Amino acid sequence: MKPATATISREALRHNIELIKTFAPQQKLLAMIKANAYGQGLLPAADTLADLVEGFGVARLREALEIQETGYTGKILLIEGFFDREELLKTLSRRFDTVIHCQEQLELLEQVAEEWQQEQQKGFWKRKAKIYFPINVWLKIDTGMHRLGVHPEQVDMFYQRLKACPLVESISFVSHFSRADEPDCGYTEKQIAIFEAATSPYPTHERSISASSGILYWKQAHYDWVRPGIIMHGISPHYTPITDLGFKPVMTLSSSLIAVRTHKAGEPVGYGGTWISDKDTKLGVVAMGYGDGYPRNAPEGTPVLVNGRIVPIVGRVSMDMLTVDLGADSQDKVGDEVIFWGKDLLIEEVAQHIGVISYELITKLTPRVIFEYE
Protein backbone atom coordinates (compact mmCIF):
# COMPACT_ATOMS: atom_id res chain seq x y z
CA MET A 1 0.00 0.00 0.00
CA LYS A 2 1.44 3.36 -1.08
CA PRO A 3 0.46 6.92 -0.20
CA ALA A 4 0.32 9.61 -2.88
CA THR A 5 2.90 8.74 -5.54
CA ALA A 6 3.84 10.31 -8.87
CA THR A 7 5.47 7.80 -11.18
CA ILE A 8 7.50 9.45 -13.95
CA SER A 9 8.31 7.51 -17.11
CA ARG A 10 11.68 8.57 -18.51
CA GLU A 11 10.99 6.42 -21.57
CA ALA A 12 7.78 8.34 -22.28
CA LEU A 13 9.59 11.67 -21.88
CA ARG A 14 12.28 10.67 -24.36
CA HIS A 15 9.66 9.27 -26.72
CA ASN A 16 7.77 12.56 -26.68
CA ILE A 17 10.90 14.56 -27.50
CA GLU A 18 11.65 12.28 -30.44
CA LEU A 19 8.06 12.76 -31.59
CA ILE A 20 8.36 16.55 -31.29
CA LYS A 21 11.35 16.38 -33.61
CA THR A 22 9.09 14.98 -36.32
CA PHE A 23 6.93 18.11 -36.04
CA ALA A 24 9.98 20.41 -36.23
CA PRO A 25 12.72 18.37 -37.94
CA GLN A 26 14.90 21.31 -38.97
CA GLN A 27 14.75 23.23 -35.71
CA LYS A 28 16.79 23.19 -32.53
CA LEU A 29 14.95 22.27 -29.34
CA LEU A 30 15.02 24.38 -26.19
CA ALA A 31 13.24 22.15 -23.69
CA MET A 32 11.30 24.23 -21.20
CA ILE A 33 11.86 22.69 -17.78
CA LYS A 34 10.76 25.67 -15.72
CA ALA A 35 8.62 25.21 -12.60
CA ASN A 36 10.42 22.02 -11.60
CA ALA A 37 10.00 20.67 -15.15
CA TYR A 38 6.25 21.24 -14.99
CA GLY A 39 6.14 19.51 -11.64
CA GLN A 40 7.89 16.37 -12.87
CA GLY A 41 11.34 16.98 -11.40
CA LEU A 42 13.90 19.50 -12.67
CA LEU A 43 17.10 17.48 -12.43
CA PRO A 44 15.64 14.12 -13.51
CA ALA A 45 14.14 15.84 -16.56
CA ALA A 46 17.41 17.56 -17.41
CA ASP A 47 19.31 14.30 -17.04
CA THR A 48 16.79 12.43 -19.20
CA LEU A 49 16.79 15.01 -22.00
CA ALA A 50 20.36 16.33 -22.05
CA ASP A 51 21.44 14.26 -25.05
CA LEU A 52 18.25 14.91 -27.03
CA VAL A 53 17.91 18.70 -27.00
CA GLU A 54 20.12 21.69 -27.75
CA GLY A 55 19.34 23.51 -24.52
CA PHE A 56 17.01 24.17 -21.62
CA GLY A 57 14.76 27.07 -20.71
CA VAL A 58 14.03 28.00 -17.10
CA ALA A 59 12.24 30.86 -15.36
CA ARG A 60 14.48 31.29 -12.32
CA LEU A 61 18.24 31.62 -11.91
CA ARG A 62 18.15 29.01 -9.15
CA GLU A 63 16.91 26.44 -11.65
CA ALA A 64 19.73 27.26 -14.05
CA LEU A 65 22.31 26.96 -11.29
CA GLU A 66 20.98 23.59 -10.18
CA ILE A 67 21.17 22.22 -13.71
CA GLN A 68 24.67 23.53 -14.32
CA GLU A 69 25.93 22.19 -11.01
CA THR A 70 25.18 18.65 -12.22
CA GLY A 71 27.90 19.10 -14.83
CA TYR A 72 25.66 20.10 -17.72
CA THR A 73 27.58 22.40 -20.07
CA GLY A 74 24.94 23.17 -22.70
CA LYS A 75 22.76 26.19 -23.28
CA ILE A 76 20.47 27.37 -20.47
CA LEU A 77 18.16 30.30 -21.16
CA LEU A 78 16.62 32.49 -18.46
CA ILE A 79 13.27 33.14 -20.12
CA GLU A 80 12.40 36.13 -17.91
CA GLY A 81 15.96 37.36 -17.80
CA PHE A 82 17.73 38.54 -14.65
CA PHE A 83 15.79 40.21 -11.84
CA ASP A 84 18.55 42.36 -10.35
CA ARG A 85 22.26 43.17 -10.47
CA GLU A 86 23.30 40.13 -8.45
CA GLU A 87 21.45 37.82 -10.82
CA LEU A 88 23.01 39.51 -13.83
CA LEU A 89 26.50 39.04 -12.42
CA LYS A 90 25.83 35.35 -11.84
CA THR A 91 24.38 35.06 -15.33
CA LEU A 92 27.57 36.54 -16.76
CA SER A 93 29.92 34.43 -14.65
CA ARG A 94 28.02 31.22 -15.46
CA ARG A 95 27.52 32.14 -19.14
CA PHE A 96 23.78 31.58 -19.14
CA ASP A 97 21.73 32.92 -22.03
CA THR A 98 19.30 35.61 -20.95
CA VAL A 99 16.18 37.27 -22.26
CA ILE A 100 16.16 41.06 -22.32
CA HIS A 101 12.59 42.33 -22.31
CA CYS A 102 12.69 45.86 -20.92
CA GLN A 103 14.64 49.09 -20.69
CA GLU A 104 15.67 48.47 -17.09
CA GLN A 105 17.40 45.20 -17.95
CA LEU A 106 19.19 46.79 -20.89
CA GLU A 107 20.44 49.70 -18.81
CA LEU A 108 21.69 47.41 -16.05
CA LEU A 109 23.56 45.29 -18.58
CA GLU A 110 25.14 48.40 -20.10
CA GLN A 111 26.15 49.67 -16.66
CA VAL A 112 27.83 46.40 -15.72
CA ALA A 113 29.50 46.24 -19.14
CA GLU A 114 30.97 49.72 -18.65
CA GLU A 115 32.36 48.70 -15.26
CA TRP A 116 33.72 45.50 -16.81
CA GLN A 117 35.48 47.46 -19.55
CA GLN A 118 37.10 49.71 -16.98
CA GLU A 119 38.39 46.64 -15.17
CA GLN A 120 39.77 45.22 -18.40
CA GLN A 121 41.83 48.36 -18.90
CA LYS A 122 43.63 47.86 -15.61
CA GLY A 123 46.76 45.80 -15.30
CA PHE A 124 46.14 42.09 -14.79
CA TRP A 125 47.13 42.10 -11.12
CA LYS A 126 44.87 45.06 -10.36
CA ARG A 127 41.72 43.49 -11.70
CA LYS A 128 39.02 42.20 -9.38
CA ALA A 129 38.83 38.45 -9.02
CA LYS A 130 35.41 38.14 -10.65
CA ILE A 131 35.49 37.07 -14.29
CA TYR A 132 32.56 37.75 -16.59
CA PHE A 133 31.98 36.46 -20.08
CA PRO A 134 30.01 37.84 -23.01
CA ILE A 135 26.69 36.04 -23.22
CA ASN A 136 23.92 35.30 -25.69
CA VAL A 137 20.98 37.68 -25.38
CA TRP A 138 17.48 36.89 -26.60
CA LEU A 139 15.61 40.13 -27.27
CA LYS A 140 11.97 39.61 -26.33
CA ILE A 141 9.47 41.27 -28.67
CA ASP A 142 5.85 41.86 -27.67
CA THR A 143 3.90 40.72 -30.72
CA GLY A 144 0.52 40.61 -29.01
CA MET A 145 0.78 38.68 -25.76
CA HIS A 146 1.18 42.06 -24.01
CA ARG A 147 2.97 40.56 -21.05
CA LEU A 148 6.73 40.93 -21.58
CA GLY A 149 8.77 42.32 -24.43
CA VAL A 150 9.79 45.49 -26.21
CA HIS A 151 7.38 47.10 -28.64
CA PRO A 152 8.12 46.30 -32.29
CA GLU A 153 9.09 49.90 -33.00
CA GLN A 154 11.73 49.68 -30.24
CA VAL A 155 13.48 46.63 -31.65
CA ASP A 156 16.16 48.46 -33.62
CA MET A 157 17.07 50.74 -30.73
CA PHE A 158 17.47 47.76 -28.41
CA TYR A 159 19.32 45.81 -31.09
CA GLN A 160 21.85 48.58 -31.75
CA ARG A 161 22.56 49.07 -28.06
CA LEU A 162 22.93 45.33 -27.48
CA LYS A 163 25.20 45.06 -30.50
CA ALA A 164 27.40 47.79 -29.05
CA CYS A 165 27.55 46.15 -25.62
CA PRO A 166 30.84 44.31 -25.03
CA LEU A 167 29.15 41.76 -22.78
CA VAL A 168 26.82 40.60 -25.56
CA GLU A 169 28.19 37.79 -27.69
CA SER A 170 25.15 37.23 -29.90
CA ILE A 171 21.56 38.44 -30.28
CA SER A 172 18.53 36.28 -30.99
CA PHE A 173 14.89 37.29 -31.23
CA VAL A 174 12.09 35.66 -29.25
CA SER A 175 8.37 36.16 -28.76
CA HIS A 176 5.41 34.18 -27.46
CA PHE A 177 1.99 33.31 -28.86
CA SER A 178 -1.08 34.07 -26.77
CA ARG A 179 -3.71 32.06 -28.67
CA ALA A 180 -1.79 29.44 -30.64
CA ASP A 181 -4.09 26.74 -29.29
CA GLU A 182 -6.97 28.40 -31.18
CA PRO A 183 -5.96 27.72 -34.79
CA ASP A 184 -8.96 29.48 -36.30
CA CYS A 185 -9.02 32.69 -34.28
CA GLY A 186 -6.80 34.71 -36.64
CA TYR A 187 -4.72 36.26 -33.86
CA THR A 188 -1.70 34.02 -34.32
CA GLU A 189 -1.32 35.04 -37.97
CA LYS A 190 -1.25 38.64 -36.76
CA GLN A 191 1.50 37.86 -34.26
CA ILE A 192 3.54 36.04 -36.90
CA ALA A 193 3.28 39.03 -39.24
CA ILE A 194 4.43 41.42 -36.50
CA PHE A 195 7.34 39.14 -35.59
CA GLU A 196 8.37 38.82 -39.24
CA ALA A 197 8.29 42.57 -39.76
CA ALA A 198 10.23 43.28 -36.58
CA THR A 199 12.99 40.74 -37.25
CA SER A 200 13.33 40.77 -41.04
CA PRO A 201 16.02 43.50 -40.98
CA TYR A 202 18.28 41.03 -39.15
CA PRO A 203 18.25 37.91 -41.36
CA THR A 204 21.36 36.31 -39.87
CA HIS A 205 20.00 36.22 -36.32
CA GLU A 206 18.18 33.25 -34.84
CA ARG A 207 14.49 33.48 -33.97
CA SER A 208 11.97 31.64 -31.81
CA ILE A 209 8.25 32.11 -31.24
CA SER A 210 6.74 28.61 -31.10
CA ALA A 211 6.16 26.83 -27.80
CA SER A 212 3.98 23.71 -27.48
CA SER A 213 0.93 24.89 -29.42
CA GLY A 214 3.10 26.57 -32.01
CA ILE A 215 4.96 23.33 -32.57
CA LEU A 216 1.74 21.39 -33.10
CA TYR A 217 -0.24 23.85 -35.20
CA TRP A 218 1.97 26.57 -36.69
CA LYS A 219 4.72 24.99 -38.77
CA GLN A 220 5.27 28.26 -40.64
CA ALA A 221 6.43 29.82 -37.36
CA HIS A 222 8.99 27.25 -36.24
CA TYR A 223 11.98 29.42 -37.28
CA ASP A 224 15.32 28.38 -35.73
CA TRP A 225 14.33 27.25 -32.24
CA VAL A 226 11.17 25.68 -30.85
CA ARG A 227 10.41 25.60 -27.15
CA PRO A 228 8.44 22.48 -26.15
CA GLY A 229 6.88 22.56 -22.70
CA ILE A 230 3.70 20.77 -21.68
CA ILE A 231 3.68 18.48 -24.72
CA MET A 232 6.98 16.94 -23.61
CA HIS A 233 4.97 15.38 -20.80
CA GLY A 234 2.35 13.97 -23.14
CA ILE A 235 -0.19 16.58 -22.07
CA SER A 236 -2.18 18.82 -24.38
CA PRO A 237 -1.90 22.61 -24.12
CA HIS A 238 -5.71 22.62 -24.19
CA TYR A 239 -8.42 20.15 -23.19
CA THR A 240 -8.24 17.94 -26.30
CA PRO A 241 -5.82 15.06 -25.58
CA ILE A 242 -2.80 14.62 -27.87
CA THR A 243 -2.35 10.89 -27.32
CA ASP A 244 -3.92 10.34 -30.74
CA LEU A 245 -0.87 12.15 -32.16
CA GLY A 246 1.37 9.57 -30.53
CA PHE A 247 2.30 11.39 -27.31
CA LYS A 248 2.60 9.35 -24.13
CA PRO A 249 1.64 10.63 -20.65
CA VAL A 250 4.81 10.88 -18.57
CA MET A 251 3.24 11.11 -15.09
CA THR A 252 0.91 8.70 -13.36
CA LEU A 253 -0.49 10.03 -10.08
CA SER A 254 -1.74 7.30 -7.78
CA SER A 255 -2.44 6.36 -4.19
CA SER A 256 -4.19 3.56 -2.32
CA LEU A 257 -7.47 2.71 -0.68
CA ILE A 258 -6.89 2.94 3.05
CA ALA A 259 -10.45 1.99 4.00
CA VAL A 260 -13.51 0.41 2.38
CA ARG A 261 -16.77 1.12 4.20
CA THR A 262 -20.40 0.18 3.79
CA HIS A 263 -22.60 3.24 3.57
CA LYS A 264 -26.36 3.53 3.95
CA ALA A 265 -28.68 5.55 1.75
CA GLY A 266 -29.51 8.97 3.17
CA GLU A 267 -26.24 9.35 5.07
CA PRO A 268 -23.89 12.28 4.30
CA VAL A 269 -20.16 12.06 3.59
CA GLY A 270 -17.30 14.37 4.52
CA TYR A 271 -16.99 17.94 5.72
CA GLY A 272 -20.23 19.85 5.46
CA GLY A 273 -22.17 16.72 4.53
CA THR A 274 -22.36 17.99 0.95
CA TRP A 275 -22.96 14.56 -0.61
CA ILE A 276 -25.74 12.24 0.50
CA SER A 277 -26.03 8.81 -1.05
CA ASP A 278 -29.39 7.93 -2.58
CA LYS A 279 -28.69 4.20 -2.19
CA ASP A 280 -26.72 1.74 -0.11
CA THR A 281 -23.18 1.57 -1.42
CA LYS A 282 -19.54 1.05 -0.54
CA LEU A 283 -17.19 3.96 -0.10
CA GLY A 284 -13.43 3.95 -0.57
CA VAL A 285 -11.24 6.30 1.42
CA VAL A 286 -8.08 7.26 -0.48
CA ALA A 287 -4.81 8.65 0.87
CA MET A 288 -4.85 11.79 -1.27
CA GLY A 289 -5.90 15.32 -0.40
CA TYR A 290 -5.19 18.96 -0.95
CA GLY A 291 -2.14 18.53 1.29
CA ASP A 292 -0.74 16.51 -1.61
CA GLY A 293 -1.80 19.12 -4.15
CA TYR A 294 -5.02 17.51 -5.32
CA PRO A 295 -7.53 20.35 -5.78
CA ARG A 296 -9.89 20.91 -2.87
CA ASN A 297 -12.43 22.27 -5.33
CA ALA A 298 -12.65 19.00 -7.28
CA PRO A 299 -16.42 18.56 -7.57
CA GLU A 300 -18.40 15.47 -6.80
CA GLY A 301 -18.23 13.16 -9.79
CA THR A 302 -14.60 13.90 -10.62
CA PRO A 303 -13.32 10.61 -12.07
CA VAL A 304 -10.63 8.38 -10.59
CA LEU A 305 -9.62 4.88 -11.65
CA VAL A 306 -9.93 1.89 -9.32
CA ASN A 307 -9.14 -1.59 -10.59
CA GLY A 308 -9.66 -0.57 -14.19
CA ARG A 309 -12.98 1.23 -13.81
CA ILE A 310 -13.96 4.86 -13.38
CA VAL A 311 -15.53 5.77 -10.05
CA PRO A 312 -16.56 9.24 -8.82
CA ILE A 313 -15.22 11.34 -5.99
CA VAL A 314 -17.98 12.07 -3.46
CA GLY A 315 -17.98 14.67 -0.70
CA ARG A 316 -15.33 17.30 -0.20
CA VAL A 317 -11.64 16.69 -0.72
CA SER A 318 -9.93 17.09 2.66
CA MET A 319 -6.28 17.69 3.51
CA ASP A 320 -5.12 14.09 3.61
CA MET A 321 -7.98 12.04 2.20
CA LEU A 322 -10.83 11.93 -0.24
CA THR A 323 -13.74 9.55 -0.69
CA VAL A 324 -14.96 7.69 -3.77
CA ASP A 325 -18.18 5.79 -4.42
CA LEU A 326 -17.10 2.23 -5.24
CA GLY A 327 -20.65 0.95 -5.80
CA ALA A 328 -22.68 -1.59 -3.86
CA ASP A 329 -21.17 -4.58 -5.68
CA SER A 330 -17.59 -3.47 -5.21
CA GLN A 331 -14.98 -6.13 -4.57
CA ASP A 332 -12.27 -3.54 -3.99
CA LYS A 333 -10.15 -3.90 -0.89
CA VAL A 334 -7.78 -1.91 1.28
CA GLY A 335 -4.43 -1.50 -0.45
CA ASP A 336 -5.82 -1.41 -3.98
CA GLU A 337 -4.31 1.23 -6.25
CA VAL A 338 -6.24 4.38 -7.12
CA ILE A 339 -5.12 6.32 -10.21
CA PHE A 340 -5.89 10.04 -10.47
CA TRP A 341 -4.38 10.54 -13.91
CA GLY A 342 -2.09 8.71 -16.30
CA LYS A 343 -2.31 6.76 -19.54
CA ASP A 344 -5.62 5.10 -18.60
CA LEU A 345 -7.27 8.26 -17.24
CA LEU A 346 -5.99 11.30 -19.10
CA ILE A 347 -5.23 14.41 -17.11
CA GLU A 348 -7.06 16.57 -19.66
CA GLU A 349 -10.34 14.85 -18.74
CA VAL A 350 -9.71 15.34 -15.04
CA ALA A 351 -8.74 18.99 -15.49
CA GLN A 352 -11.82 19.75 -17.54
CA HIS A 353 -14.05 18.14 -14.94
CA ILE A 354 -12.48 20.19 -12.15
CA GLY A 355 -12.48 23.40 -14.20
CA VAL A 356 -8.73 24.00 -14.22
CA ILE A 357 -5.98 23.49 -16.80
CA SER A 358 -3.65 20.50 -16.77
CA TYR A 359 -0.70 22.80 -16.08
CA GLU A 360 -2.15 23.60 -12.66
CA LEU A 361 -2.65 19.97 -11.69
CA ILE A 362 0.90 18.85 -12.43
CA THR A 363 2.68 21.90 -11.01
CA LYS A 364 0.79 22.04 -7.70
CA LEU A 365 1.77 18.65 -6.31
CA THR A 366 3.40 19.14 -2.92
CA PRO A 367 6.66 17.72 -1.53
CA ARG A 368 4.63 15.15 0.40
CA VAL A 369 4.01 13.27 -2.84
CA ILE A 370 6.54 10.50 -3.44
CA PHE A 371 8.24 10.75 -6.84
CA GLU A 372 9.46 7.57 -8.49
CA TYR A 373 11.35 7.52 -11.80
CA GLU A 374 11.39 4.56 -14.10
Curated annotation (Swiss-Prot):
GO terms for cellular component: cytosol. Keywords: Isomerase, Pyridoxal phosphate. GO terms for biological process: D-alanine biosynthetic process. SUPFAM superfamilies: Alanine racemase C-terminal domain-like (SSF50621), PLP-binding barrel (SSF51419). Pfam families: Ala_racemase_C, Ala_racemase_N. The active site is at K34, Y271. Its EC number is 5.1.1.1. It is an enzyme of class 5 (isomerase). Substrate binds at R147, M319. It comes from the Bacteria. Its cofactor is pyridoxal 5'-phosphate. Belongs to the alanine racemase family. Catalyzes the interconversion of L-alanine and D-alanine. May also act on other amino acids. This is Alanine racemase. It comes from Actinobacillus pleuropneumoniae serotype 5b (strain L20).
